[in-house]
Regions:
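Mitochondrial intermembrane space
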Residues: 3-4, 14, 18-193
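Short helix-onset patch at the extreme N-terminus, typifying the N->h transition
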Residues: 7-8
């Protein structure tokens, strides 16, 4: 599992080291081959594991590959769309791994884990949308500020809803007045009605 993180770090470091220069077709092809080789090596490492640990390792390896490919494309053909795609790939990879880690749990603990993973995924996706709005050109500073403010407002609403669902799931472990108070506190904390 640590290998996937090391893989991501080395690929990102390699990509950042050459990010100031334009990437040639040969460099792009070599980087793609390295990503593929790193993924195969990570998969081989995962094959030694058993049960859910193997599943988690495979999700980490696949996520690392997807993120590295998206970041490579963002570097090879820089654009706001490619950068956003890389952010989304990172969010999706983290979500897949977090969800897979929940499989070791049972009952309410598993439900809470899945809701927490979903909340983290929603947060990452909404942050990517805000960054996309901030990078989008506008006719004036006021217009750009309004676009970013609207994106932040929408993102906050989505994040609060996801966090509320996770908090509410935690409350399901309780009963009676304690559960009612817990749900009311969660509603108040995340602005839900």
């Amino acid at each position: 599992m640590q290998i996937a993180r090391t893989l991501i770090a080395s690929v990102v470091a390699g990509l950042m080291a050459t990010s100031a220069m334009a990437m040639t077709d040969a460099e792009h092809k070599a980087a793609k081959e390295k990503i593929s080789a790193d993924y195969k090596a990570a998969k081989t490492t995962c094959d030694a594991l058993k049960a859910n640990a193997k599943d988690i390792c495979m999700k980490e390896a696949k996520g690392a590959e997807d993120v590295a490919k998206a970041e490579l494309e963002a570097q090879y053909k820089p654009s706001d769309k490619a950068t956003n795609k890389a952010r989304m790939a990172r969010a999706d990879a983290d979500y897949a791994v977090a969800k897979e880690k929940c499989d070791d749990l049972t009952g309410n603990a598993k439900d809470v884990c899945v809701k927490d993973a979903k909340a983290a995924h929603t947060t990452a996706k909404e942050n990517a949308k805000v960054a996309k709005a901030a990078a989008k050109p506008a006719d004036s500073a006021a217009e750009k500020g309004a676009q970013v403010a609207e994106a932040r407002k929408d993102a906050t609403a989505e994040k609060n809803e996801a966090n509320y669902k996770a908090a509410k799931e935690r409350c399901d472990a309780m009963s009676g007045d304690a559960k009612s108070k817990c749900v009311d506190d969660a509603k108040r904390m995340y602005g839900q009605s």
